[in-house]
């Protein structure tokens, strides 16, 4: 699943091509995603200008003349900017054409993504209004994490992936950040002290920024809007490296399951 770095890479690429452009045509080939794509978008969107493209958590927000188009990549979604004459392929479900002869194409083999319209205050959308802070913002700091973890018996990894506490951190980057912080993913969140929380917040921010700089992680489906893969997977400390030597101490990387997700860690480096 694309996590925050991959969605941010997508946003930056799309913004270069689409911000300020006027939508000319909408094509819906398969409306069946996580929620059905409204056929009303075919008449509603043409003529509207895309004023800005923002990101909230893993949602892409296209601020248009009369509302906001919301996109989520789901498990396998991908957005490409292509010439409008490019023939569609299997799993290409939605096209948004603009006034420079280009289009935004939404491809989603597993169809867990979403394309929604909201004409009110975007902060009040039901999918967005209860989200936690952005992990790269000043609102997410050591004191915030320390406060949010008090009395929690859930593992710190599960808390990091709770979108009501902090957004955008998926399985890959939770594993990597916990290794960088030297904290076991199995530790109860409420057991962390203030110093550990500060160290973990710093590791989360550093890991996400490094991933964005590397173009994100391309393990299965992800490419940026021009079709280029990311390379952060080449820098993984523990994720996907079970049974291999820890790059820091030589101990074999361990693997377990937490909440239906694979967890990777070094028992020597992480406590």
Swiss-Prot record:
<keyword id="KW-0378">Hydrolase</keyword>
<feature type="active site" description="Proton donor; for beta-elimination activity">
    <location>
        <position position="58"/>
    </location>
</feature>
<dbReference type="InterPro" id="IPR000214">
    <property type="entry name" value="Znf_DNA_glyclase/AP_lyase"/>
</dbReference>
<dbReference type="Pfam" id="PF06831">
    <property type="entry name" value="H2TH"/>
</dbReference>
<dbReference type="GO" id="GO:0034039">
    <property type="term" value="F:8-oxo-7,8-dihydroguanine DNA N-glycosylase activity"/>
</dbReference>
<comment type="similarity">
    <text>Belongs to the FPG family.</text>
</comment>
<dbReference type="Pfam" id="PF06827">
    <property type="entry name" value="zf-FPG_IleRS"/>
</dbReference>
<keyword id="KW-0479">Metal-binding</keyword>
<dbReference type="GO" id="GO:0003684">
    <property type="term" value="F:damaged DNA binding"/>
</dbReference>
<dbReference type="Pfam" id="PF01149">
    <property type="entry name" value="Fapy_DNA_glyco"/>
</dbReference>
<feature type="active site" description="Proton donor">
    <location>
        <position position="3"/>
    </location>
</feature>
<keyword id="KW-0863">Zinc-finger</keyword>
<feature type="active site" description="Proton donor; for delta-elimination activity">
    <location>
        <position position="261"/>
    </location>
</feature>
<feature type="binding site">
    <location>
        <position position="91"/>
    </location>
    <ligand>
        <name>DNA</name>
    </ligand>
</feature>
<dbReference type="InterPro" id="IPR012319">
    <property type="entry name" value="FPG_cat"/>
</dbReference>
<dbReference type="InterPro" id="IPR015887">
    <property type="entry name" value="DNA_glyclase_Znf_dom_DNA_BS"/>
</dbReference>
<keyword id="KW-0234">DNA repair</keyword>
<keyword id="KW-0227">DNA damage</keyword>
<dbReference type="InterPro" id="IPR010663">
    <property type="entry name" value="Znf_FPG/IleRS"/>
</dbReference>
<dbReference type="GO" id="GO:0006284">
    <property type="term" value="P:base-excision repair"/>
</dbReference>
<keyword id="KW-0511">Multifunctional enzyme</keyword>
<comment type="function">
    <text>Involved in base excision repair of DNA damaged by oxidation or by mutagenic agents. Acts as a DNA glycosylase that recognizes and removes damaged bases. Has a preference for oxidized purines, such as 7,8-dihydro-8-oxoguanine (8-oxoG). Has AP (apurinic/apyrimidinic) lyase activity and introduces nicks in the DNA strand. Cleaves the DNA backbone by beta-delta elimination to generate a single-strand break at the site of the removed base with both 3'- and 5'-phosphates.</text>
</comment>
<feature type="binding site">
    <location>
        <position position="110"/>
    </location>
    <ligand>
        <name>DNA</name>
    </ligand>
</feature>
<feature type="binding site">
    <location>
        <position position="152"/>
    </location>
    <ligand>
        <name>DNA</name>
    </ligand>
</feature>
<dbReference type="InterPro" id="IPR020629">
    <property type="entry name" value="Formamido-pyr_DNA_Glyclase"/>
</dbReference>
<protein>
    <recommendedName>
        <fullName>Formamidopyrimidine-DNA glycosylase</fullName>
        <ecNumber>3.2.2.23</ecNumber>
        <ecNumber>4.2.99.18</ecNumber>
    </recommendedName>
</protein>
<keyword id="KW-0862">Zinc</keyword>
<dbReference type="InterPro" id="IPR035937">
    <property type="entry name" value="MutM-like_N-ter"/>
</dbReference>
<feature type="zinc finger region" description="FPG-type">
    <location>
        <begin position="237"/>
        <end position="271"/>
    </location>
</feature>
<dbReference type="GO" id="GO:0008270">
    <property type="term" value="F:zinc ion binding"/>
</dbReference>
<comment type="subunit">
    <text>Monomer.</text>
</comment>
<dbReference type="InterPro" id="IPR010979">
    <property type="entry name" value="Ribosomal_uS13-like_H2TH"/>
</dbReference>
<keyword id="KW-0326">Glycosidase</keyword>
<feature type="active site" description="Schiff-base intermediate with DNA">
    <location>
        <position position="2"/>
    </location>
</feature>
<dbReference type="GO" id="GO:0140078">
    <property type="term" value="F:class I DNA-(apurinic or apyrimidinic site) endonuclease activity"/>
</dbReference>
<keyword id="KW-0456">Lyase</keyword>
<dbReference type="InterPro" id="IPR015886">
    <property type="entry name" value="DNA_glyclase/AP_lyase_DNA-bd"/>
</dbReference>
<keyword id="KW-0238">DNA-binding</keyword>
């Amino acid at each position: 699943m694309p996590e925050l770095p991959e969605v941010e890479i997508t946003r930056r690429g799309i913004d270069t091509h689409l911000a300020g452009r006027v939508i000319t045509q909408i094509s819906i080939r398969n409306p069946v995603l996580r929620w059905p794509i409204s056929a009303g978008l075919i008449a509603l969107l043409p003529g509207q200008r895309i004023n800005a493209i923002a990101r909230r958590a893993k949602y892409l927000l296209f601020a248009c003349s009369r509302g906001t188009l919301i996109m989520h990549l789901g498990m396998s979604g991908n957005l490409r900017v292509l010439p409008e004459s490019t023939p569609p392929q299997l799993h290409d479900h939605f096209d948004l054409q603009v006034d420079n002869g280009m289009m935004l194409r939404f491809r989603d083999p597993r169809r867990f993504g979403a394309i929604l319209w909201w004409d009110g205050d975007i902060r009040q959308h039901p999918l967005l209004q209860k989200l936690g802070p952005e992990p790269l913002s000043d609102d997410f700091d050591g004191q915030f994490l320390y406060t949010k973890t008090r009395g929690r018996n859930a593992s710190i990894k599960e808390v990091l992936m709770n979108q009501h506490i902090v957004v955008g951190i998926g399985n890959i980057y939770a594993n990597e950040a916990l290794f960088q912080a030297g904290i076991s993913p199995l530790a109860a969140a409420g057991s962390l002290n203030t110093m550990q929380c500060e160290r973990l917040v710093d590791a989360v921010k550093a890991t996400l920024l490094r991933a964005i700089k590397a173009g994100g992680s391309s393990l299965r489906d992800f490419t940026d809007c021009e079709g280029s893969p990311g390379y952060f997977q080449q820098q993984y400390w523990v994720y996907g490296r079970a049974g291999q030597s820890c790059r820091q101490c030589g101990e074999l990387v361990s693997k377990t399951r937490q909440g239906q997700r694979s967890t990777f860690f070094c028992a020597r480096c992480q406590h």
